[in-house]
């Protein structure tokens, strides 16, 4: 079964009124992965979303909490010590940030074939996970 991991920027753009095209694309991706039951996020993604939404997007914390509550149709993966160890290996092997490596580690553990992210190199494979930029058409 096809499984897709959604990086924090997908959730952030879904709430970003200053980026209407990216907002449209992010919302479409969230709807599709939730409807198909193949969307995966991690606690890291939810935590990063809350901080970014309330600080950068100036969304009221209660509103951000309500947005988080709408994510229940996505599988929520809790982080493990093994994820952290694999992320450290990923930093060394792939020369990516620890936080990006932690996303890749969680996606691999969830058996996702793709990570949707704007932050990593689109088209590149990290282990068994391929990165796709869902906003490529918005920035082209």
Where do the model's predicted regions map?
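Acidic active-site catalytic centers that drive phospho-/nucleotidyl reactions
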Residues: 7-9, 48, 100, 119
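Short, well-structured N-terminal submotif of metal-dependent ribonuclease cores
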Residues: 1-41, 56-62, 138-140
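Glycine/small-residue-rich phosphate/adenosyl-binding loop
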Residues: 46, 50, 54, 58-69
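Active-site neighborhoods of divalent-metal-dependent phosphate/nucleic-acid chemistry enzymes
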Residues: 2, 76-118
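Acidic, PIN/NYN-like endoribonuclease modules and their adjacent C-terminal/linker elements
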Residues: 104, 109-140
């Amino acid at each position: 079964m096809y499984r897709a991991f959604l990086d924090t920027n997908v959730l952030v753009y879904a709430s970003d009124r200053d980026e209407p095209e990216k907002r449209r694309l992010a919302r479409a991706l969230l709807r599709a992965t939730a409807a198909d039951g193949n969307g995966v996020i991690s606690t890291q993604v939810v935590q990063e979303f809350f901080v970014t939404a309330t600080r950068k997007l100036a969304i009221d914390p209660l509103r951000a909490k309500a947005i988080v509550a709408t994510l229940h149709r996505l599988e929520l993966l809790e982080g493990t010590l093994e994820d952290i160890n694999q992320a450290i290996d990923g930093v060394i092997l792939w020369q990516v940030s620890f936080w990006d490596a932690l996303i890749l580690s969680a996606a691999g553990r969830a058996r996702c074939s793709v990570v949707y992210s704007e932050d990593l190199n689109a088209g590149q494979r990290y282990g068994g996970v391929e990165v796709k930029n869902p906003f490529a058409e918005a920035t082209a």
